[in-house]
A protein has these predicted regions:
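Charge-rich, low-complexity N-terminal segments
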Residues: 8-47
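N-terminal amphipathic/basic-hydrophobic helices that include classical n-h-c signal peptides
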Residues: 1-13, 127-134
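Active-site recognition of the HExxH zinc-binding catalytic motif
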Residues: 94-106
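Active-site scaffold of zinc-dependent metalloenzymes
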Residues: 44-90, 103
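Short alpha-helix boundary/capping segments
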Residues: 88, 92, 114-117
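Post-HExxH zinc-binding segment in Zn-dependent metallohydrolases
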Residues: 115-143
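Ordered hydrophobic segments in well-structured contexts
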Residues: 6, 26-30, 65-69, 74-82, ...
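Short helix/strand-bridging catalytic loops that position acidic/His residues to coordinate divalent metals
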Residues: 107-114
């Protein structure tokens, strides 16, 4: 499993920081649409405040969106999921799988792997999905 570092405890709309098993890549899930909370989460992984504004502007009507940027040390990924959107549990999980695949693709791009094996891809997707599913459940339990 990826390493977890708590960003904010006791706040369901903030995320743990997950690190990829290879490379210098980390990712979080944000399910809140409140600007201050999104900006605070992004600040935890060293995103410049002006970029947080760009992320929010790009949100539009998307159910979910994956944002990727680099700083001197990390490839950083924020997955935003609109927790107020309609849909059953299977539909919501399917969207999370879609976003997880973007993370897996970025992991392999980051380490220069152009043709990862099927089993390796499946393993990474399983791990990222698991992390995002657990995080999504923690952030949205009781809704």
């Amino acid at each position: 499993m990826a390493a977890r570092a708590v960003v904010f405890t006791g706040n369901k709309s903030m995320s743990n920081i997950f690190t990829a098993p290879i490379g210098q890549l980390r990712y979080i899930l944000v399910t809140d649409n409140d600007y201050e909370k999104v900006a605070a989460a992004m600040d935890e992984i060293d995103m410049e405040p002006r970029y947080a504004e760009d992320v929010l502007k790009q949100w539009g009507d998307s159910v979910a969106r994956t944002h990727i940027w680099e700083n001197n040390e990390w490839i950083n990924i924020v997955v935003r999921y609109d927790r107020q959107r309609e849909g059953n549990a299977l539909q919501k999980h399917a969207v999370i799988v879609h976003e997880a695949m973007h993370i897996v693709q970025e992991i392999f791009r980051h380490v220069g792997e152009e043709a990862p094996g099927d089993e390796v891809q499946a393993y990474f997707l399983q791990e990222v999905c698991y992390n995002l599913f657990v995080e999504f459940q923690e952030q949205t339990s009781g809704e």
